[in-house]
């Protein structure tokens, strides 16, 4: 939907085959997943329907932006929860459901998935500004005028310079201005604020694992939290 040419370091479907094929491919995947889930019972179908609903709501909210007196930072985090957290939560819930664990454990694993999904997107927000080796060109979101968490914190800071505030209020297509904005953001307190929020979501994911019995799966999930949280360090 954002016409991005690269997704996770790989050429995007819409860039390679065009929007029509990309959209229809997504529709096909949803249809095929519904067909597979139909054999697993009504609860499995319900989880998918609720997840798809959240995904669409998240995309709609991102497209229209925060409304009225809605806090842009809260809005951003809720969009990440709906667009990414919901998907990882559903994956965790399915695994727990099919393994036959208790409802309490299932909820914990789903909440772990949601938390790590949000943490992943927040690390992406940071990497867009500070990394040269993240699989995406630094400042891609800045060029497109997308307000990531560091940008939102910078705009909310009364001490942010008028020049940086002006740059962050629009898409930055000029190379010199783009480099200027990146350099200013990299030393701005907004980066530390965004890292702190990332750590909070990573800590929440770790907390959800705490009550689970020790096993290889738990160890792997704990390692996953660290790899997500610290890829932006």
Language-model segments: which ranges?
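All-alpha prenyltransferase/terpene-synthase fold signal
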Residues: 1-233
């Amino acid at each position: 939907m954002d016409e991005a040419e690269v997704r996770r370091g790989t050429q995007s479907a819409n860039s390679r085959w065009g929007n029509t094929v990309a959209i229809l491919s997504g529709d096909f995947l949803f249809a095929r997943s519904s067909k597979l889930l139909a054999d697993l019972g009504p609860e499995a179908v319900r989880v998918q329907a609720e997840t798809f609903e959240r995904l669409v709501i998240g995309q709609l909210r991102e497209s229209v932006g925060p409304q009225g007196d809605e806090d842009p930072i809260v809005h951003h985090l809720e969009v990440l929860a709906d667009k990414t957290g919901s998907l990882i939560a559903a994956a965790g819930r399915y695994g727990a459901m099919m393994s036959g664990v208790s409802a309490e454990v299932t909820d914990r694993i789903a909440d772990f998935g949601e938390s790590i999904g949000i943490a992943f997107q927040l690390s992406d927000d940071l990497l867009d500004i500070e990394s040269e080796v993240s699989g995406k060109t630094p400042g891609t979101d800045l060029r497109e005028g997308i307000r990531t968490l560091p940008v939102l914190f910078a705009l909310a800071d009364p001490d942010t310079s008028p020049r940086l505030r002006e740059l962050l209020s629009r898409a930055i297509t000029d190379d010199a201005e783009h480099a200027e904005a990146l350099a200013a953001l990299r030393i701005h307190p907004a980066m530390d604020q965004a890292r702190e929020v990332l750590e909070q979501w990573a800590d929440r994911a770790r907390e959800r694992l705490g009550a689970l019995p020790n096993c290889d799966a738990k160890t792997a999930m704990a390692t996953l939290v660290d790899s997500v949280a610290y890829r932006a360090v």
